[in-house]
Amino acid sequence: MNPPGSLGVLEEKEEEHLAPPILGPSIHSDNPQERIQARRLRIAARLEARRREALGEYLDGKKESEEDQSKSYKQKEESRLKLAKLLLCGTELVTNIQVAADIREIHRRVEEEEIKRQRLEKLENEVKTSQDKFDEITVKWEEGKQRRIPQELWEMLNAQQVHCAGLIEDKNKLISELQQELKMKDDQYVKDLKKQSDDICLLLERMEEQVKNVMKTFRQELQNIEKAFEVERQELLTSNKKKWERALQAHNAKELEYLMNRIKKVEDYEKQLNKQRIWDCEEYNTIKIKLEQDVQILEQQLQQMKATYQLNQEKLEYNFQVLKKRDEESTVIKSQQKRKINRLHDVLNNLRSKYNKQVKQFQEENQSLTSDYKRLVLQFKELQKAMRHFALIDDKRFREIWLMNEEEAKDLINRAFDVDRIISTHHLGLPWMAPDFWFLKNVGPISQQQQKSATQILEEVLMEAEKEGADEDSSESETYLDLPKQVSARTTRKILMLLCDESGFLIESKLLSLLLPLEKNECYLLRLDAVFSALGIENEDDLYKLVNFFLKYQTHHSPSSQEPLDLRAEKERSLVDGKSQEKEPPPSPKLIHPNDVLKILEAFVMSLRKPRDFWVPVKLLKAVRDDSKDSEYWEALTTVIPATTLNLWDALYTALEKYHLVLTQRAELLIENSSLERQNTELQQLLQQYLDTKINSELQVPPTQVFRVPTK
């Protein structure tokens, strides 16, 4: 029986034999043409595999190996689960002893705390009672010092002895109780030690038993796994032997076929050689006759060439004399040119020295300019830092001033609302409701609405496309987004799906493996999010630019884009306004070939990179805040009380002034009335005093008979 390791090596060798290394173009390459070629080769390999499968040439060994692997994997998983369950149960059985010991210790500590608390309370009570008794004995000793009668002293001494004996007896009793409790604790400690030793023995027994069970189970499962691998090995040997026999039969058949074809080819070659020999003989005779004729013609030409040679020799002698004279003239000219070259060399040396001086001067100027440039850059950065600091301070002060003015304005508005409420409810008797304006809930400077991100727009597009796909057969109208040329959500979704399928090289392999168990829409959403991150598409405008770029690229590069494509393009063009009727309809994404997606993406990325090549001035401050709605906001705060209410307040103010005047006059009259009443009371008192005098009773006609005295 072979060990499992050798079987694993055989499986690895078989996998290496079945899966040769890929030496051609890769789909992960940076070159688009190489990726396209790799895709084409992969498609061709799939077609070849389908053809072989149809012809019965498919390798059945791979399927058998997968089945065998599934059997061994199943056996290993069963063994792993069984062993894990056994280890878990054994661990729980062993740890139960520790858990029980911990619970007993917790209960013991709780009881010990309670007993300790009771003991302390008992000792405190004993101390208090003993102190009271001791104080009582001490007081009686002081009283005994004051007594002088011996009998009383004797009685007092006996009483003091009794009290002291009682105090000592209480102390001895407490000591005996504490000693008894200490003895019980010693006994309990011995029992706990015995219990712990018993628990340790039990723990060791269970651990030994668990180790034996685990070892036994491990051996049994190992035997089962070895049996499963041995069965797989036998099946693999049988299948390989069958494949080898089939391969030998096919090889023998091909050898026989090759031998028959070779015999036929030898016979055909012999016939062709005979024909070639006859044709070569005929051609040889023909060439021989032709060459003899050519020899005669060449002899005639040789005679003519001799005559021509004689004539040319005389001409050459004459030309030699002419050239000799010209050589003498060229020697004179050459000497003149040498003198001229020497003068030019002197001029060149002077120019070189001047050039070196200029280069040195320019280098010094360059160094000085470079140092000035660095100094200016540092000053510029410091200026940038200061301007950013002042910008932040200005923003902070602006917000503080805004909040202060806003709080003051809202306090005044609340006071105005309180006045309006009091006037309406108390003076006019009308119901009053607090107004609800948008600017009353605002706190701080007014901020503009943020732009949507590309992921949010993508979710909306997928949702709209699902709704359109559900109503595609029964609905004739489409929902359009705010995309260029009023492109439908379905068209946008097709473009994005095509982009997602053809730009997988922009997504990491780990992310692709994590996206497999997800749903289709979630998978598309996450993949497109990764593609957008790689392309630098962040917001709504960038997504619209990408879709518009796809449509424009297809319009300029497709010859059939000048004609109406389908009924959907007609519907899209009919929804655009009057100006858009003169424009061309948007092309259908069905006409965009998948191989053109990479070219379009490359052109789009290059168009995004072009503006970055130019120098852009550094942005010193953050974007200028939009203050177009500030004046509207503050004017709205000043108009919270309408003009009708202000007119009502003016009329009420006039009426209240009149009412105040009447109340003032009434108060003055009340003061005058009270002064008159006081004077009247004083006069009545004087009159009563006059009437009550004794002189009036002596008169014949008293004043009380002449007039009636008014009573108060």
Curated annotation (Swiss-Prot):
Biased composition of type Basic and acidic residues is found at: 565-585
Which protein, by its recorded name, is this?
Answer: Dynein regulatory complex protein 1
By sequence similarity, the record places it as follows: Belongs to the DRC1 family.
Which PANTHER family does the UniProt record give?
DYNEIN REGULATORY COMPLEX PROTEIN 1, NYD-SP28 PROTEIN
What residue ranges carry the coiled-coil annotation? 100-388, 663-698
Q: What does this protein do?
A: Component of the nexin-dynein regulatory complex (N-DRC) a key regulator of ciliary/flagellar motility which maintains the alignment and integrity of the distal axoneme and regulates microtubule sliding in motile axonemes. Plays a critical role in the assembly of N-DRC and also stabilizes the assembly of multiple inner dynein arms and radial spokes. Coassembles with CCDC65/DRC2 to form a central scaffold needed for assembly of the N-DRC and its attachment to the outer doublet microtubules.
Q: Which compartment or compartments is the protein found in?
A: Cytoplasm, Cytoskeleton, Cilium axoneme; Cytoplasm, Cytoskeleton, Flagellum axoneme
One CC-aspect GO term: axonemal dynein complex
- One GO process term, biological-process aspect: axonemal dynein complex assembly
One Pfam family recorded for the sequence: NYD-SP28_assoc
- Top-rank taxon: Eukaryota
